[in-house]
C-alpha cells in the first residue's frame, strides 16, 4: 500500500482520523511502535495518545467499555447537518455532538450496526 498520500480527495468527506481502544495502553503503544514504527504524543485528554506518523490522524486510548471497537472518523462540514441526514437514512446516534479542543465529533451507527464517527473542524 502506497502511503505517499497521492490519492485525490473526491468530495472532502475523507477519513480524517481513527481511534484504537486499548485495555492496556502502554502495551499497545509498544506493539504499534514495534510493528509500524508509529510515534506517540500525549494528547490533551487524559489517557489519550496521538499517533504522529500513521499517514492520517490517529489516536490510542483507554477502553471505556469491553465492547468498544476501533472507530474511523469522516470529515464533514456540519455535525448537525450530517447527523440529521444520517438519521433520515436509518442511522442511530451513539454519542451526540461533543466538543474537544480541535473541533467537534459525534458517533453514529449505520443501519447494519457499524459504528463510525463524523468530525467537524473548528
Model-based region annotation:
Residues 14-23, 64-89, 105-109:
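Vicinal oxygen chelate
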Residues 56-59, 114-116:
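Short, charged/polar, Gly/Pro-enriched secondary-structure boundary elements
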Residues 93, 98-109:
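C-terminal structural segments of small proteins and small subunits
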Residues 31-32, 86, 113:
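Conserved active-site tyrosine of GNAT-family acetyltransferases
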Residues 12-57, 102:
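Core segments of cupin and vicinal oxygen chelate
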Residues 1-29, 70-74, 122:
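N-terminal beta-strand motif that seeds the catalytic metal site of vicinal oxygen chelate
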Residues 51-54, 108-111, 121:
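Active-site beta-strand termini and strand-to-loop segments that position acidic
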Residues 61, 107, 118-122:
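Short beta->alpha transition motifs characteristic of CBS
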